[in-house]
Curated annotation (Swiss-Prot):
Annotated EC: 4.2.1.19
GO MF, one example: imidazoleglycerol-phosphate dehydratase activity
HAMAP family to which the protein is assigned, alphabetical: HisB
Signal peptide (from-to): none
Keyword check for Amino-acid biosynthesis: yes
Top-level taxonomic group: Eukaryota
Species of origin: Neurospora crassa (strain ATCC 24698 / 74-OR23-1A / CBS 708.71 / DSM 1257 / FGSC 987)
Name assigned to this protein: Imidazoleglycerol-phosphate dehydratase
Protein family membership: Belongs to the imidazoleglycerol-phosphate dehydratase family.
Record keyword Amino-acid biosynthesis present: yes
Keywords: Amino-acid biosynthesis, Histidine biosynthesis, Lyase
Pfam families associated with the record: IGPD
GO BP annotations, alphabetical order: L-histidine biosynthetic process
Length: 229
């Protein structure tokens, strides 16, 4: 029996524009970060903002928007990722560029880390509650970027994050990751709970979709024979 370990599913890069400066490192299976991880992330991790470390995961998110950090922390935790992400954006304007660009960068990192999707489940679905709120997420590693998001949020803001940006963040992530996602909050009175249950459901569905299937190594989970085009 072969004891060869699968290749790491990780990515690290910086994304700099006139609007945002982002550094990101992602490991879809938890554990260590790639050797090319930007040294600036070490400072962010040491700061301890939205940070959690265990034997299986390291998570540190610092975007300058507290509620966005909270949502991405939940996404990484329940997807089983190690994620280090730091952003300095033009928050003196508003939260749009920062929230959008961070989720685009996360989607690109996801796609790069995933590579050619062979030997994987491909599909994932999950329901996640948070007290009175219940959300459902369905994910397809389709290479066909599409998102349908209905969270039913009523407040203008949660913390410093505009609620209109919360579904937009999921759209931005799905587009850059080149996946199909459907995320719905089915019930709930508290907008914080509605949003958080949605991100947790997305996390669990994504973890399921990216899981390796024993005995199907190298197989493409598609009748088309490829998910690369």
């Amino acid at each position: 029996m072969s004891t060869e370990q699968p290749a790491p599913r990780w990515a690290a890069f910086a994304r700099d524009t006139n609007e945002t400066k982002i550094q990101i490192a992602l490991n879809l299976d938890g554990g260590a970060f790639p050797p090319e991880t930007d040294a600036r992330l070490n400072v962010s991790i040491a700061d301890g903002h939205a940070t959690q470390a265990s034997k299986s995961q390291t998570i540190s998110v610092n975007t300058g928007i507290g509620f966005l950090d909270h949502m991405l922390h939940a996404l990484a935790k329940h997807a089983g990722w190690s994620l280090a992400l730091a952003c300095k954006g033009d928050l003196h304007i508003d939260d749009h560029h920062t929230a959008e660009d961070v989720c685009i960068a996360l989607g690109y990192a996801f796609a790069k880390a995933l590579g050619t999707p062979t030997g994987l489940a491909r599909f994932g679905s999950a329901y996640c509650p948070l007290d009175e709120a219940l959300s459902r997420a369905v994910v397809d590693l389709s290479n066909r970027p599409f998102a349908v998001v209905d969270l039913g949020l009523k407040r203008e803001k949660i913390g410093d994050l505009s609620t209109e940006m919360i579904p937009h963040c999921i759209h931005s992530f799905a587009g850059a990751a080149r996946i199909t996602v459907h995320v719905d909050c089915l019930r709930g009175d508290n907008d914080h709970h509605r949003a958080e249950s949605a991100f947790k459901a997305l996390a669990v569905a994504t973890r399921q979709a990216t899981s390796r299937v024993a005995g199907r190594e190298g197989e493409v989970p598609s009748t088309k024979g490829t998910l690369s085009v």
